[in-house]
């Protein structure tokens, strides 16, 4: 088992594709990505380093049945983590959103995961600058005007995804390897 676990929730399959790309770029130092609807709490807690990916649905929600998803996803999985101790774990987040059509909640679901893992004692790494995006609001922005993780827009900036992932992974290396 590798020391890095990649977990994702998805609605349309785009987050799964990005998780697979990240796994490929990590070239053997991470286990294959796990969809949270098939993952167990024990699998999640077994990794010292977690890369967590989510799309943002509706009004800034995590994917899940309550948000209109067809399947269970992050909404349901986070319930299994309500008492989890993530102290000593390093977490990095990536989120998918559409900054033009959902400008008022661009990648806001990343903030829900961020708040959850911080409250459980994890150390979050991999903040990303706001520059290069055009949106009106994102709950995923911190006070320093950086995102809590890597925002990706597969609808409007898909041509920047691979370059952004490469830069983000380089930034993460000192903290996760």
From Swiss-Prot:
GO terms for molecular function: electron transfer activity; FMN binding. Residues 4-173 form the Flavodoxin-like domain. The keyword Electron transport applies. The keyword Flavoprotein applies. One of its GO terms (biological process) is nitrogen fixation. It comes from the Bacteria. Low-potential electron donor to a number of redox enzymes. NifF is the electron donor to nitrogenase. Belongs to the flavodoxin family. This is Flavodoxin. The gene is nifF.
């Amino acid at each position: 088992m590798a020391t890095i676990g990649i977990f994702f929730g998805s609605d349309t399959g785009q987050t799964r594709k990005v998780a697979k790309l990240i796994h490929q770029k990590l070239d053997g130092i991470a286990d294959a990505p796990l969809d949270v609807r098939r993952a167990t709490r024990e699998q999640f807690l077994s990794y010292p380093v977690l890369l967590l990916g989510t799309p943002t649905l509706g009004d800034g929600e995590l994917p899940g049945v309550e948000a209109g998803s067809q399947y269970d996803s992050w909404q349901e999985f986070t319930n299994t983590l309500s008492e989890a101790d993530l102290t000593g774990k390093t977490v990095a987040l990536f989120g998918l959103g559409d900054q033009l059509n959902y400008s008022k909640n661009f990648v806001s679901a990343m903030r829900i995961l961020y708040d959850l893992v911080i409250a459980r004692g994890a150390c979050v790494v991999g903040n990303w600058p706001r520059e290069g995006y055009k949106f009106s609001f994102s709950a995923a922005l911190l006070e320093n005007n950086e995102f809590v993780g890597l925002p990706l827009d597969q609808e409007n900036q898909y041509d920047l995804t691979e370059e952004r992932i490469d830069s983000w992974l380089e930034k993460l290396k000192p903290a996760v390897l």
